[in-house]
């Protein structure tokens, strides 16, 4: 229109998604989740969180990953069951205060970076309703210099591969365990080969949560 300039305004006051709680510190009740930042899908910008809430959810179905496509967990949210408040959204996860009763589960020791080894490990995640199950992976590379892609792994568990095709969206934050200790959390999937994923060190998340 000649010399007339037009501008557009994009406004969004809330965002909802499915991810996995990585840890709760039983002493401070600080939690960490996702292992990466929340991005606004239309702008690809990191979301600046003023207030946020984690709710109970219930996995209803899985869209399987395949080469060139990252699948997803599909969930029903129970907005009347609040578990905690999100305080910050960072490049290494979301963090906040867990305000519900901490589940009576066995606590895990935290592994240092030096304790993590190439070889077999497990991830814990939910694929059906609210049932946490453990699945086999193989760690094939450890990079202490990377910001978030510290642990490279391949899913070897047949049941998990049959159900998901590999790493799916919503699996971010799933704890990674080795030799009875928590070592990290799932962060990313390789789109060209969804059986391969990345995780970051749990010590990075714990340090960020305490800031």
Please identify what each model-predicted range represents:
Residues 1-211:
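C-terminal recognition in membrane/secretory proteostasis and scaffolding
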């Amino acid at each position: 229109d000649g010399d007339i300039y037009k501008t557009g305004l994009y406004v969004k006051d809330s965002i909802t998604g499915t991810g996995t709680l990585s840890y709760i510190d039983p002493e401070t009740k600080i939690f960490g989740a996702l292992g990466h930042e929340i991005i606004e899908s239309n702008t690809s910008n990191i979301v600046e969180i003023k207030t946020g809430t984690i709710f109970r959810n219930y996995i209803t179905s899985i869209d399987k990953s395949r080469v060139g496509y990252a699948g997803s967990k599909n969930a029903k949210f129970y907005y009347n069951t609040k578990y905690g408040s999100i305080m910050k959204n960072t490049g290494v996860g979301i963090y906040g205060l867990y305000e519900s009763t901490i589940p009576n589960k066995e606590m895990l020791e935290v592994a240092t970076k030096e304790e993590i080894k190439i070889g077999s490990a497990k991830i814990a995640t939910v694929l059906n309703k609210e049932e946490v199950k453990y699945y086999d992976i193989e760690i094939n590379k450890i990079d202490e210099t990377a910001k978030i892609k510290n642990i490279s792994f391949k899913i070897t568990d047949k049941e998990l591969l049959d159900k998901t095709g590999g790493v799916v969206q919503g699996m971010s934050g799933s704890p990674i365990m080795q030799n009875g200790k928590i070592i990290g959390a799932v962060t990313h999937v390789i789109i060209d080969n969804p059986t391969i994923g990345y995780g970051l060190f749990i010590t990075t998340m714990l340090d960020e949560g305490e800031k």
